[in-house]
Amino acid sequence: MKVSVLAAVAAFAAATAIAGPVRPAGVGNDKYLIELAPGKTQWVTKNEKHQMKAAGQTFIDITDEFGTGFTASQPVSANYPKNSRHSSIVAPIIANLSKENLMRDLKAMIEFNNRYYESQTGVESATWLMEQVQKAIDASGIQGAKVEKFENQFQQFSIIATIPGSESTVVIGAHQDSINEQDPEGGRAPGADDNGSGSVVVLEALRGVLGSKALQAANNTNTMEFHWYAGEEGGLLGSNAIFKKYKSDGRQIKAMLNQDLAGFVKKGGPEQFGLITDNTNQELNQFCKMIVKKYASIPIVDTKCGYACSDHASADRSGFPASMVAETAFRDSNPHIHSADDVTDYLDFDHMLEHAKVAVGFMTELAMASNL
């Protein structure tokens, strides 16, 4: 990261930041409204968004909120279990999780030139992913289970798989898109870790849950949703659209677990999860720690990633409790992301399998929880 680039971005931000979402005179359709912190917004071009992303600046694109009166919400209340109560269901699911599936699925995802949200290959990769989800649902035979597209104002669509239950809903999500920060629209962006790893973890967790006869027999109390978001690299576009709609519709989203970066272990460093503690729900974070201790074989440490660093922030600002369990402490994250070098050579599939265990434990325990 060059100092000159950072200085230029800082100067640009200082010159163009505005106090609130007020459209300045002369702003055209080529400008996008982004939020860098609560209440701190500015209008930028797509290229400027890319430059800021490359310089390490995180943000959420709120262009479609302009003039709507949208305001961030406080999280809805939820009552999370203090201890695991359904290990007899979770343990067999975990035992059947497949590292080979993770490897196979990720190999397929990185074969697309990129999964950029405004590229044709971004649409093709989303189509492939949705086909895998549909196959898993078809194989399960679970009545009412379904997968749907969530269309966006850009090319790539988001994907939502649902296993029905009560109005209370538990979500596990991951963004499916990738980006090459040097050439966003056409550059090679395999996105093995960012975020092919999280995408295949959520897919394997879905397969595990769908394949559990014990869970089917127990008749899950709460609705389960598995999400794959489009356009995270453009400013949490896909997830923000979904959770804003859920807020508008009065949905009862009781918990959301974000899986973004799930495969990298720093050479010579400790193998551990990173629990994101900023812009997340502290009660749900404590539940995540319990799940990790119960079902995973590696520890978890607190870490921070900044405002709008990933899709949990979309759930959080719409008033839904959210957590993110990342591959490690943020300072030790994969240095190869957002480039052509984000490949599987740097990933640890055993570590990825640990993420899948946590995802299954999180979803199953909360799906069966009464009075969430």
UniProtKB/Swiss-Prot annotation:
Family matches, as Gene3D superfamilies: Zn peptidases (3.40.630.10)
Cellular component terms (Gene Ontology): extracellular region
UniProt key word Iron: no
Cofactor(s) the record lists: Zn(2+)
Disulfide bonds: 305-309
Enzyme superclass (EC): hydrolase
Annotated binding of Zn(2+) 1, by residue: 175, 194, 260
InterPro entries according to UniProt: M28_fam (IPR045175), Peptidase_M28 (IPR007484)
EC number(s) on file: 3.4.11.-
Residues of this chain annotated as glycosylated in UniProt: 96, 195, 219
Main location: secreted
Keywords for this protein: Aminopeptidase, Disulfide bond, Glycoprotein, Hydrolase, Metal-binding, Protease, Secreted, Signal, Virulence, Zinc
Binding sites annotated in the UniProt record for Zn(2+) 2: 194, 233, 338
Signal peptide annotation: 1-19
Cofactor binding note of this UniProt entry: Binds 2 Zn(2+) ions per subunit.
Subcellular location: Secreted
GO biological process: proteolysis
Record GO terms (molecular function): aminopeptidase activity; metal ion binding; metalloexopeptidase activity
Keyword set includes Metal-binding: yes
PANTHER family: AMINOPEPTIDASE YDR415C-RELATED (PTHR12147:SF56), METALLOPEPTIDASE M28 FAMILY MEMBER (PTHR12147)
Family: Belongs to the peptidase M28 family. M28E subfamily.
Role according to the record: Probable extracellular aminopeptidase which contributes to pathogenicity.
Assembly: Monomer.
Annotated protein name in UniProt: Probable leucine aminopeptidase MCYG_08380
